Structures are given as C-alpha cells and as structure tokens.
C-alpha cells in the first residue's frame, strides 16, 4: 500500500511542477512578416510591450530582401524562398521604423512601422 501512495504522491508532485513551469513562462507573441517584391505584408506591425516576440520572416519574392528595425541589432538578409526566425525583446513601448536597406527597395515601398504598446 505504501508503494502505491508513493506513486500517487510522485504523480501529484510532477503535475504540480509541470503547472508551475508553464505558469512561469512569460507571454510570447509570434509575428509573421512576408516579404515580396517590393513590400512587406503589413505597413503597420503591432506587438505588445514588455513581451518577447518571435519574428518569422519569409521572402516570397524573386529578389533578396532584408529587414532592419531601427532599434539596434535587428538586421537580417533573407534570400528568395527562405524563412528566418528570430526572437527579440521585450521591447519598450514606442514606434520603430522597419525597412529593407538594399539600395532602392525602401523607395519602392519596402518600409513599415513597428508599434509597441
């Protein structure tokens, strides 16, 4: 009988630890951005402040493009047909400019605004 009680107690402790581990994780948002010739899938990208964010960026165009967010350190070149995933944050509230830095692409419309609130 004591062996069965030990198994039950172990199961309850394991379940409790699993619930605590799930509850301890901070919120996480995934933002999907599609790059094409010559635009991003959205002109305004909104994300919550104070949370880590995962960006999934897919280039469906025929030309290489990049994504640079004017917040320091976020600049990724993405080849045609490729997907790049990167995590950032948490970010402070504000507006950040997003653009393709390949010459002429921003002027053709490859820019957006990242709004963090």
Question: What are the language-model segments listed below?
Answer:
Residues 1-11:
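Bacterial N-terminal signal peptides that target proteins for export
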Residues 18-21:
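C-terminal motif of bacterial Sec signal peptides marking the signal peptidase cleavage site
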Residues 23-25:
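Bacterial signal peptide processing site
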Residues 27-50:
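N-terminal edge beta-strand
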Residues 42-45, 73-77, 86-88:
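Beta-strand-rich interaction surfaces with strong enrichment in secreted/lumenal proteins
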Residues 53, 63-65:
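Short beta-strand/loop motifs in extracellular/secreted proteins, especially
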Residues 57-59:
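Asparagine-centered strand-capping/turn motif at beta-strand->loop junctions
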Residues 80-117:
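Extracellular/periplasmic metallocenter environments
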């Amino acid at each position: 009988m004591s062996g069965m009680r030990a198994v039950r107690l172990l199961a309850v402790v394991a379940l409790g630890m699993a619930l605590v581990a799930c509850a301890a994780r901070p919120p996480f948002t995934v933002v999907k951005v599609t790059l094409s010739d010559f635009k991003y899938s959205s002109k305004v990208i909104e994300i919550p402040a104070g949370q880590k964010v995962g960006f999934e960026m897919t280039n469906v165009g025929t030309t290489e493009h990049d994504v640079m967010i004017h917040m320091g350190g976020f600049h990724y070149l993405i080849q045609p047909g490729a997907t790049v995933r990167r995590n950032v944050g948490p970010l402070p509230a504000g507006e950040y400019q997003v653009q393709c830095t390949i010459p002429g692409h921003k002027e053709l419309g490859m820019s957006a605004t990242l709004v963090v609130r």
